[in-house]
A protein has these predicted regions:
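Flexible, charged surface loops at secondary-structure boundaries
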Residues: 1, 57-59, 212-216
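N-terminal glycine-rich anion-binding loop in soluble enzyme alpha/beta folds
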Residues: 2-57
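Structural beta-sheet core signal
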Residues: 5-7, 65, 111
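Mixed-charge interfacial surface used for oligomerization/domain docking
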Residues: 10-18, 28-31, 36, 75, ...
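Short glycine/serine/threonine/alanine-rich loop segments
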Residues: 23, 61, 179
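Short gly/ser-rich anion-binding loops that grip negatively charged ligand groups
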Residues: 39-43, 65-76, 114-118
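N-terminal glycine-rich phosphate/adenylate-binding segment common to multiple enzyme folds
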Residues: 48-90
Length: 216
């Protein structure tokens, strides 16, 4: 059994690693505004995902797609649509590209919501890339994310508020009082662990939270 892994650019993996592990990457798009507003991001299109999954299927019997958390992006929604389209296409074209296409096992193409992003997503993808089938790869990815915890502070809460990732009241407190929350990415979205005044205090508390989570 052979496995090809697909992810998106939120995994932040380097080109040498991608080449070494033969990992297919679909880019998330950054959209620059002309009026001076901050850049925004856009999920990959269904067609971009179909094309990536098809390339992966051309060199492996099973495909595992591991994507950025659905709490941060709609990528996983398009990924599931793309997977359904490609599976339907292969059912009607048994002699299509890829090893033993006509004899592919059920669930030969699996889509996994990682529940995370950036480095934690990258580690999950790397863990999965060592597996020989999609089921084992998904289990390794999920075990990796279960061991990870993403904590962070940001300089401008307005961007998170405009995208709906935090509430606007929290963002206004930052602007008026200099309140900075220490944030955590969970499967349900971005959660505030604590709020402090000032960026320096927020960074100190972030380090303290990280040490606590790590068992230090």
């Amino acid at each position: 059994m052979s496995l090809a892994v697909v992810t998106d650019s939120a995994a932040c993996l380097t080109e040498p690693l991608l080449r070494e592990r033969a990992i297919e990457v679909v880019p998330l798009h950054a959209i620059a505004a002309d009026n001076g507003e901050p850049a925004t991001t856009s999920r990959p299109s269904v067609q971009e995902l179909v094309d990536a999954y098809r390339r992966a299927a051309g060199r492996a019997e099973e495909v595992l797609a591991i994507h950025i958390s659905s709490a941060l992006s709609g990528t996983i929604d398009n990924a599931r649509i793309a997977a359904a389209q490609l599976e339907a296409e292969y059912r009607t074209q048994p002699n299509g590209p890829g090893p033993s296409v006509g004899r592919r096992r059920p669930q030969w193409l699996r889509v996994v919501d990682s529940g995370t992003s950036s480095g934690a997503l990258g580690l999950a993808v790397l863990a999965a890339s060592g597996a020989h089938d999609a089921r084992r790869g998904a289990a390794l990815a999920q075990a990796s994310t279960a061991r990870s915890c993403q904590l962070f502070v940001v300089d401008d809460l307005g961007r998170l508020a405009r995208s709906g990732r935090i509430d606007r009241t929290t963002a206004r407190l930052d602007g008026v009082l200099g309140i900075r929350p220490v944030l955590a990415l969970t499967r349900d979205g971005i959660r505030t662990l604590e709020t402090v005044r000032g960026a320096a205090r927020a960074r100190r508390d972030l380090i303290a939270q990280a040490v606590r989570v790590a068992g230090g």
